[in-house]
Amino acid sequence: IDVSRSMQAQDLAPDRLTKTKLWAAELVQILKGQQIGLVVFAGAAYMYMPLTDDYNAAIDFINGITTEMASYQGTAIGDAIETAQKAFGDETNKSRGLVIISDGEDHDSNAIQAAEKAAKKGIVITTIGAGTEKGALIPEQDDLGFKYKLDEEGQPVRSKLNKEELIKIAAAAHGRYYSLDNPRSALEGVKNMVDNLDKGTYDVHETSNNISLFPWLLWPAFFLFLIEMIMSMNISIKTKSNNRT
């Protein structure tokens, strides 16, 4: 989960953070039967919810997520990937998928390197772009009321989606990039990743079907998912069968 303040920008309605929650609510339904964990990140990353198949508990965790959770600003995607990798452990009889939802702005320099290391551990990464390339101002609120974030020169800060970086991160870990502005395609893409985690790598591509979310599926949910699926270990099964023979 990217919880940096830029996720409050309103180039996605009603804002990036809320849009992500609505989209991820549907994803939770698709991923039932898998273990899901949650990492939140801004200037740093930490494990917010360990891997679990308790979806009610997961939603309770998500209900508490805000951009105020971040002590340091930034977009530490590399740190988030490393945190997720540690949560997965070193088991080789399971396939793992990582879904990162972020605007990709102000990213750390080691994100691609972290993705490459994750790929060597068999982790496939899908990135979801939250925002638009045109961007939007970042709203803030203090005791004096509503305002926009200003830079050092006193000018409003416009936050823009860094799509290119998110595409590179996905490519480094054999994954695909999707836009949160096209929620149905993104859902189908993640579902495809889960269904095919044990079938090889993926080509990075971008899709463009723009389909609205259904109101009855607008639940609070995840930005960054850890998906762990038990793989069918054919070689292992054959070995055990031969030993019994």
Label each PLM-derived region with a short phrase.
Residues 1-96, 110-113:
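Membrane-embedded segments
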Residues 5-6, 43-47, 104-107, 131-135, ...:
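Solvent-exposed loop/turn segments at secondary-structure junctions
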Residues 39, 100, 126-129, 178-179:
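Structural recognition of the beta-strand scaffold that forms the well-ordered cores
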Residues 54-57, 143-146, 195-198:
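Short, hinge-like loop/turn segments at secondary-structure boundaries
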Residues 71-75, 97, 104-172:
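VWA/integrin I-like adhesion module and closely mimicked acidic/polar interface patches used
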Residues 166-196:
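Extended, hydrophilic extramembrane loops/domains of integral membrane proteins
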Residues 196-245:
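C-terminal signal-anchor/stop-transfer transmembrane helix together with its immediate cytosolic
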